[in-house]
C-alpha cells in the first residue's frame, strides 16, 4: 500500500477520488492493522513527505486508536492493545521522533498521537518513560521544534489523562513547563507552548502550588509573561492567571496586592482585544469565586459551623478602579461582528453583572452616574452602553434601592424601543427583560404595563435578535403577574389576545434566525402555562393552529434535502410538541375532547422522524403530559403507543431518550394502575437490561430503580414475579460507593443511585403491604437496614436522600407493628437518622417526615 498516495487523495476536491482513497485505507486497516499503523507512522515521520500528507497520517493514526463515543473508544483501545509489543513500540518511537520535526503540522499531529496513546498506556504503566522523555526534550540546548512539540504533547496529556495518574510526575512536568515559559526563553513559539502546557497542568499541581516557594516562582513566571511584547504570549499568560484564580483563590491575597491588580487593569486597556478579553475574564473569575465562597460561608453558618474559606473581598476592594474601566469598555461595541462573536463590550457587560452580584449596593451609584450621563447621548455607542450598564446591575443590589430607579428609568427605556439604531433597541429589549426578571415588583401594572407591552409587541415585528429579547421579557412578565391558581383573570389577561396573535405570526416563519422562532414558541408555551381561565377559548384556538402546523410538518418530511433543512425541521417539530405539552397540562382532563387527534399526530411524528432525531424526546414528553391528564382514560392509546415506548427504552445509545422513556413507564404505571400488568414483562425485561448495560449513561440508572417503585405500587403483590431479580439488583446497586477523594459527579451519582434504591424499597414495601403480603419482603429487610445504615453514615448525604430514608424507616416500622423488627430499630444509628431530619436547615417536609418516622419507631420499642 502506498500510504502517502492514498493520504493525499483523501484531501482531493474530487469526491470520487476522496471516497476511493478512504475506502482503500479502511480496507488496509481491516486487512492488516499492524502494517497499517506502521506505514502511517512511517509517513508521519517522513521528512520528505509534504506537510499536509504527514498531518493526514497523524490524524488517521489518532482516529484509529481513539474516538469520542465511549463504546467505540473502548473498541479501539482493545484493538491497539492487541497489537504486538514491537509494533506498538515502533509506532510510539516514530511519533516521538516526529516531535523534533521542523515542520509544525507534522510535529503537532505527532503530539496529538502521543497524547492519544498516553491516555491508554500511562494509566496501566505501559509507557513508564514517556514523561521522562518529554521532560528531557524540553531541556536546555534542545532544538526549538522539539521543545515546542514536546510541550504541546505535555499539554494534551494533561487534558486527557487523569490527574491521579500524573500526580507522581507533577514536579518534573512543572519544572519543564515553567522553564519553557520563562522570559529567558528566546523562542516565542516555545514559550507559548509552555504556557499552554502550564494552563493544562494547573489542576494536578495543587501540592506544588501549596508550597509558597514554588507558587511564588510560578506566579513570577506567569506575571512576567503578561509583559511580553508578543500578544499571543500575553493572552496565554492572562489565561493562566484566570485559571489560577479559579483553582487557587484562597492563596491569592499576596499576589493581588503586589502584582495582579495592576497587571490586569493594564491588560484591560490593551489594544489587542484577545489580551483585553482575558484580563476582563480574570475579574469575572474573581467575582465568580467570591460568589461561590459567599454561598459556602452562608451554608456553614446555617449549619452553625465555622466556614472553611474566607472571602478576601478582592472585587469590593477593586470596584472603584475596575468599574470605570468596564464602563468604558462597554462603549467598544463592534457593529460588524456576528451576534455569536465574543467581544470586549460583551465581556465587560458580563463582568459588570458579576460585580453587581458580589458588591451589591456599592455598584449602583457609579453605574447610575454613567447611565445618566450617556442615556441621551447622540452617539449610539454611548446610549447602548448606558442601557447595557443599567440592565447589568439589576441582580445583586437591594431591590428596595433599585425600585425607585427602575420606576424612573422605565418610561425612558420604553421610548428607546423605537431608537433608530438596532443595537440600542436590542439591548433595551434585553434590559426590559432584566427588569421583569429581577425587579418586577417595580413595575406598576396601572402605570407601566400597557406601554411596556405595546413596546414589546412592536419589538416582535422587528429584527429577529430583538424578537428573541422581547419574547424573554414577555415570559418574565407572564410569570410574575400569573393568576393565582388559574383564577378567572389577571393583570396580563387583557393583553393575551394581542400577544398570542403576534407570537403566532413570529412562529409562522420558515427560518429560525437568532433563535427567534424558538423563542416565540417558548413564550407561547409560557403564556399558556400561566393563563387564566378566561382565556381558555384562545388557548383552544392555539391548539387547533399547532395541530395543523404539526400535521403539515409531518407531510414535509419527504421534502427535506440536507442537514441544515433537517435541523430546522427537527427544531420546528420539537417546538410544536413543547407547546402541545403546555396546552395538554393546562387543560388537564378536559383535553380528552381533542386527545384522539393529538395522539394520532404525535405517534405519526415519532414514526416519520429519523431514528436519531431529538424530536422523539419531545413527543414522549407530550405523551407523558397526556397520560397525566387522562390517567386511566389513556388506556385506549396504550396498544399503539407501547411499541414506541419499548423501542425508546432499549435505545442505550441515546441516553436522554431512554431516560424520558423510563420516566414515562412510571407515568404509565401511575395512570393505569393494575391495567399496566399485561405490559410489565416487556417493560421489566428492558429496564433490567438497561441497568446491566455498560453502554447506557449511568445517570439514567437511578431513575430505573425508582421506576420499579411505580410498577410495584401499580400491580401490588403481582410484583412477586419480578421480586427476587429486582432485590438482587438493588443489593448490587447498594454496594456502589464513592471512593475517597471522589469528584462531585461521582458523589452526586452515588447519592442519586441510593435515592433510587430507597424509592424502590418504599414502593415495593407499600405495594405488598396493601395486598397483605409482607411475607414477600421479610427476606430482604436486612438489606434495607444495611443500606439505611450506610446512608446515615455518609457525610455527603443529600436532604432528599435523608428524607427518602426516613420514609423507608417509617414504612418498615408501620408495616411490622408487632415488633418483628425490634432488634433492627434498636441500633444506635436509627436515632442518628431520625435526628438528621430535624436539623435547623432541614425543610419543613423533612422535619414532618422525621417526626412521623420517630412516632412509628417509638411504637416498635413499645411493641
From Swiss-Prot:
Importin beta subunit that functions in nuclear protein import through association with the importin alpha subunit, which binds to the clasical nuclear localization signal (cNLS) in cargo substrates. Docking of the importin/substrate complex to the nuclear pore complex (NPC) is mediated by importin beta through binding to nucleoporin FxFG repeats and the complex is subsequently translocated through the pore by an energy requiring, Ran-dependent mechanism. At the nucleoplasmic side of the NPC, GTP-Ran binds to importin beta and the three components separate, leading to release of the cargo. HEAT repeats lie at residues 2-31, 33-62, 85-124, 129-159, 170-201, 212-248, 253-299, 314-360, 364-392, 399-439, 449-481, 496-530, 536-586, 592-630, 635-671, 677-715, 720-767, 778-815, 822-861. SUPFAM superfamilies: ARM repeat. GO terms for cellular component: cytoplasm; mitotic spindle midzone; nuclear envelope; nuclear periphery; nuclear pore; nucleus. Disruption phenotype: Essential for growth. Spores germinate, but fail to divide. Gene3D superfamilies: Leucine-rich Repeat Variant (1.25.10.10). The keyword Repeat applies. Belongs to the importin beta family. Importin beta-1 subfamily. GO terms for molecular function: GTP binding; nuclear import signal receptor activity; nuclear localization sequence binding; small GTPase binding. Forms a complex with an importin alpha subunit. Interacts with Ran; interacts specifically with the GTP-bound form of Ran (GTP-Ran), protecting it from GTP hydrolysis and nucleotide exchange. Interacts with nucleoporins. The gene is kap95. Keywords: Cytoplasm, mRNA transport, Nuclear pore complex, Nucleus, Protein transport, Repeat, Translocation, Transport. One of its GO terms (biological process) is mRNA transport. This is Importin subunit beta-1. Residues 21-101 form the Importin N-terminal domain. Disulfide bonds: none annotated. PROSITE patterns: HEAT_REPEAT (PS50077), IMPORTIN_B_NT (PS50166). It is found in: Cytoplasm; Nucleus envelope; Nucleus, Nuclear pore complex. It comes from Schizosaccharomyces pombe (strain 972 / ATCC 24843) (Fission yeast). Its main location: cytoplasm.
